[in-house]
Amino acid sequence: MISANNITLRLGKKALFEDVNVKFTEGNCYGLIGANGAGKSTFLKILSGQLEPTSGDIVITPGQRLSFLQQDHFKYDEYTVLDTVIMGNKRLYDIMKEKDAIYMKEDFSDEDGIRASELEAEFADMDGWNAESDAATLLNGLGIPTEDHCTQMADLPGAAKVKVLLAQALFGNPDILLLDEPTNHLDLDAIAWLEEFLINFENTVIVVSHDRYFLNKVCTNIADMDYGKIQLYAGNYDFWYESSQLLVRQMKEANKKKEEKIKELQEFISRFSANASKSKQATSRKRALEKIQLDDIRPSSRKYPYIDFRPNREIGNEVLTVDGISKTIDGVKVLDNISFIVGHDDKIAFVGGNELAKTTLFKILAGEMEPDEGSYKWGVTTSQSYFPKDNTAIFDSDELIVDWLTQYSEIKDATYVRGFLGRMLFAGEDGVKKMRVLSGGEKVRVLLSRMMIMGSNVLIFDEPTDHLDMESITALNNGMIKFPGVILFACRDHQVVQTTANRIIEFLPDGSMVDKVSTYDEYLESDVMARKRQVYNTTADEEADD
C-alpha cells in the first residue's frame, strides 16, 4: 500500500496540489487521469520519491518494493538489454554482480566463500535462478526478439528502448508499480500483451494513460485529478465518466430545487414580514432560508477541441491503386511487393509492429519518398492531407502559427484561419506564437487544424494521438468517425482503431502484408491472428525449453 498524506506542491505562487490525501491499496489498478498540466506525471514523481513535495509525506508499507517506468532513454546505454531489465530489482542485480566478482577472483579466500554462501542464499530466496528467463519472457511479450537480449541498449532504436524500460519496471513482481504513459511507442500487439499482464498483476498499480480502451481494460479504480485535488472512483474509465456526469447532473438538479425553494421563501418573507399575524412564519422562513446552501459546481478544467473534417469535394469511386511497391532502407526490405486497392468508403487501419513499414508507405503515398519498385495512382477526384509522425522539419521555423496555416487555406483571411485555431484551443495571442516554441500537443493540434482547413477527401494519419490528452483524442476519434471520405491511418489507440476502421492491413516483419475487411476487434479474433498467436507461442515455448 502507498498513501499520500496532506501533499502540497507549489511552483512559485501557484499550488499544483493542495492538501492531497489519497490511499492506493493492494490488488487494485488505479488510472490517474486529468487534463494536460494537471500534474499527473509530477504526482507520480512525488510517489516514487523522485520529487519532494512542498509539504506532506508519502507512506509505503514497510518492506514493500516500488518500481516505476524510467523516462530517461539513455540512462542504461552502457548495459545490455537483459541486464537493464534485471536492474528493475536493484538488490537482485547487485547480488548477481557481487557474486560474479567474487567467483572471478584468483585468490578466493575463506571470507569470500562465506560471503558467496550468504549471497547465494539470498539469491535463491529472490528466485534469482529464474531472473534471466523471467526477463526474457517480459522482453518477448513486448516484442523484443531473443537475438536482441544481449545487445547494448545504445544500439537499440528509441521505440525498442521504451519497451526494455517497461520490462524493467515490470520485472521481479514489485509491490507497487507506477507507470507513466506505458503505451507510448508500443504497437497494438505489445499494448494487448501489457493489458493481460496488468489484469493478472496482483499488487498495486498506478498508471497514467491517455488510452481509454487501455484504462477500461486494466483499471479497477480511477483517480481523477482536477483543481489540485484527487478524487477516487471505483470502476474503470467509462464508469468514472458516467459517474462524474451523473454526479454533476444530480448536483444541478438539487441546486435547481433549492433555487426554487429560495425563491418561494423570499416571496413569502417579502409579502408577510410586515404583517403582524404572519411575522412568526416569516421569521421561521428566514431561518430556513439561511440554512439552504447551493452546491458549488465547478466546471471541469478539461477542455475539448472541436475537430470536424469536411471535404470540399465528394470523392469518386476510383481512390487509390497501389501496385507492387517495394522499398529497402539501410539494407532492410521494409516493403516487399505491396499491392492493394482503396475503395471510396474505406477507412483502413495499418497495424502490426513494423512501424517503419507503415511510415514508409505513408511517405510514399504523400509524395515525400519514392518507391524502389512498383507504383501507385490516386484517383482524379481525390485530394490528400498527410499527418506525419515526425514533424520536426515543419516546426523548425520562426513563422507565426496563423501565417503558416493561412497558406493552406483557400480563404486568405486571418479571422477565418483564427477560427480553426480557436476550435483547437488556441485562444487570444496563442495564434501569434512562433512555430518552433510549440509543445508536442500544440504541434499536433496545429497539424490537425491544417487538415481541417485544407478540406481534403483523403486523410492520412501516422500516429496522430501521440502527445494528445484524452479530451483531444476523444475529439479526434469523433472527427474520424464522422468524416465522409477515405482514411488511411496508423494509431496506437485501440479505441480509435476499433471505432474508426472498417478494414485492417497488417505489415508483417518480412515486409509482406495481410488485408482483411473487418473491425479491429474482429480481426484480433480472426483465423489470421490465431495463426500468428500459435506461431508466437510455439517460438516462446521453444525458447523456454532451451
Positions of PLM-derived features:
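Conserved catalytic-core segments of large NTP-driven translation/proteostasis enzymes
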Residues: P305
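ABC ATP-binding cassette signature C-motif
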Residues: M1-N255, D308-D546
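Proline-centered turn/helix-capping motifs that create local helix->coil transitions or kinks
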Residues: N130, S277-Q281, K291-S301, K377, ...
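Intracellular alpha-helical coupling/juxtamembrane segments of multi-pass membrane proteins
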Residues: S243-D296
